[in-house]
Amino acid sequence: EIFNMKFDVIVGNPPYQLNVGNTTGNSCKAKSINHMFIEQAKKLNPRYLTMIVPSRWMTRSVEGIPDKWIDDMLNENKISVIYDFLNSQDCFPGVQIEGGVNYFLWDRDYKKECRYILNINKDTIYERVDFLNSNKTDIIIRDPFAINIIKKVNILNPNYIKNSEQNFSSIVSPKDFFTNKTLLTSSWKDYK
């Protein structure tokens, strides 16, 4: 409540990011701030919250959003539906947002699977109903072919994704391959 007002529904298109000083460089590396607006909206305890934001949070390929925030979004199971656009121009013609955009419906009283609709392009839409972190990857698998591969791998070995001794993640770096932050690295014993 604010001044004795109650909020049943909050709708927003929050600012996406803070410029990190590089106006001509890699804008997808700017510090994301949209999660702060989502958190503030949740504190108002609305019944429903819907916002449109860049999709990079779903794959953890974003600067500025804490892992805990992403974990909470994936595991609280309060998002009843996500409409995800791989190409932001399919949602906002003429606007390029790296990684695409999504809008979601967060429901305070909901605790079930999410209806995930992926707009691959104007003619191809993929839909599934599942918990956002059902494969325990700690990201939303956007690619419909990849999700089927991961499900098959999980059937063969349920611990494969989380056990770095069994999977590929122990020998490669997940991001920032060629930036000044880190070079391409590997712990593979035969890496030269």
What name fits each language-model region?
Residues 1-82, 87-91, 100, 104-116:
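SAM-dependent methyltransferase catalytic region
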Residues 5, 87-192:
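C-terminal substrate-recognition regions of SAM-dependent nucleic acid methyltransferases
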